[in-house]
Amino acid sequence: AIYLNPIFMSTANHRYHTYDYWHVDPILGENPIFFLLLNEAHSRGMHIVLDGVFNHASRGFFQFNHILDNGEKSPYLDWFHVYGFPMNAYQGKPNYSCWWNLPALPQFNTDNPQVRKFLFEVAKHWIEQGADGWRLDVPFEIKDESFWRQFRAATKLTNPDAYLVGEIPSEAQDWLQGDMFD
């Protein structure tokens, strides 16, 4: 398989700061070029595994920006863990959960069913488009393992052969029982 680092629209050159999960970053050729890559790889018997960053998004992510613009009135308020207003997204200590305390990387509230639905839809969409699996970034940062069980169920329902692997920097036995990762 060919493993691709994050390919979605991002504010960072490595694309771990995703702001649009539905489009391949133009610097990488946009969606049509990705589909061409998928077709060419598949025609040669190769598989494509995408890097899924589902613990956090970019500060440029629409739902996060909606909170910045609308505060407590935003319907997306519960998509993230926000601890006060006004939000300190650019100056001072952030008053929301962010990965490694980096203000540019707000952490999703993956306990929120709407967030789960969104992320599972993203995962299913790209499998439906022909991706063969996911390499999942920092899955251990999402503390509720039911998230990954549901993620697996949604992905495998779309393609039972989809490959799921997580970035686990420690003993991975618990993750490899057939209900989260392959």
Give the positions of each predicted feature:
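The substrate-binding groove and active-site-proximal loops of carbohydrate-active enzymes
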Residues: 17-31, 101-116, 132-142
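Active-site-proximal helices and loops of the catalytic beta/alpha 8
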Residues: 38, 42-44, 56, 61-72, ...
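Aromatic-lined carbohydrate-binding/catalytic grooves of carbohydrate-active enzymes
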Residues: 1-36, 46, 145, 151
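Catalytic pocket of metal/acid-base enzymes, prominently hydrolases
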Residues: 92-99
